[in-house]
Amino acid sequence: MTSSTGLPAAGATESESTEGRGTAVGRRRGRRIGRLMIGLVAALALVAGVGYTAYVGAVGSDQLIHPTGNSDCRTPLVRYGWTYEPINYDITDDAVLRSANPDMENCSSQGAAAGTEVITSDGVRIAGWYVPSADGSGPTGPTVVLAHGWGANKSEVLKYAVPLHAAFNVVAFDFRNGGRSSAAATTFGPREKQDLEAIIDWLERTKHPAHLAVMGNSMGGGAAVLAAATDQRIEALILDSTHARVEDIVSRRLEVDAGHPSLPGTPAILFGIWLRTGLNLMDSSPVDFIPALGHRPLLILHGTADVHDLPARSADVNYQAALAAGVPVELHMCEGAGHGHVIDTCPVDWGRWSVDFLDRAFGPTD
């Protein structure tokens, strides 16, 4: 030991003093090494966390704006025996497509690209089909536009025409990045709104329907709400399996499809989409635009087993927003239906709910 003067204490040998100093130095060195290790681990964790977040944001945003396209290319004639008019492409190409694809549910391509007759305000070419109603009401008869969901196309959404075809003209079209329409980033509504408006412009130029409604499935419903908020030509809306807020789509796909936590992945993906498109998708959530419908009626259909757009966070939220704003609204739930499968699980109910709603919305027809 040492005295307060720093000299060896009485009775302490020089070796004991040296050993004591060495022990103290060792303890201090050990503490420094411990702090360095903790700092290193924290730094590595930070780097790993930042790397993971950046990876999820980059990959997730790319997958969401560039979905794998639906390979179904069946036309109304092939699928249901219906006559139809092609929108913005030559009908002879359908024969070419059919001969090249014996299995039209799994086509190698969607055919020739759309022409120049229907172009959006940002230069995207849109293709579709016009299917006259079975009752022969003619082009001025009540018309329903079908807007498909994320990664789908006009062939996939055609099934919704089955209960409508008897009394309504029906239009099915490809959003950007799907079917015959131009390749462009998918944006879950804000730019798809322009695609829908281009189709309505075509209808107005060529058919002059007396009444017009839009049925949107999932993402298509979001685009329909955004369009209807500013386009009074849309007299009524049907939302099938449609989200309330865009961030919920991202978080649920992360959790359900990819097995990743919603945090920090959701904000990272939304940030990645902003970097790629310049759009803050949280500014385009349908629930925020539903009040703009005013007195135009809204029908909400949803499945109780939808794990992608949970009813409590989508259908219920949209319904309450409509009620609060005084929008005439109906809500029907299909027991056991998953996302986008209300019409598959409850086909009779879907038809009854939709046709009755449209009859009330359009009123008596001559």
Predicted segments with their positions:
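An N-terminal hydrophobic leader/cap segment in hydrolases
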Residues: 45-117
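Short beta-strand element of the alpha/beta-hydrolase
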Residues: 139-149
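The serine-hydrolase catalytic nucleophile loop
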Residues: 150-164, 175
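Conserved alpha/beta-hydrolase
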Residues: 164-182
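Alpha/beta-hydrolase active-site loop
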Residues: 186-207
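Alpha/beta-hydrolase fold nucleophile elbow
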Residues: 207-218
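Hydrolase active-site cap/lid region
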Residues: 226-282, 291, 296
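Serine-hydrolase catalytic core
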Residues: 277-357
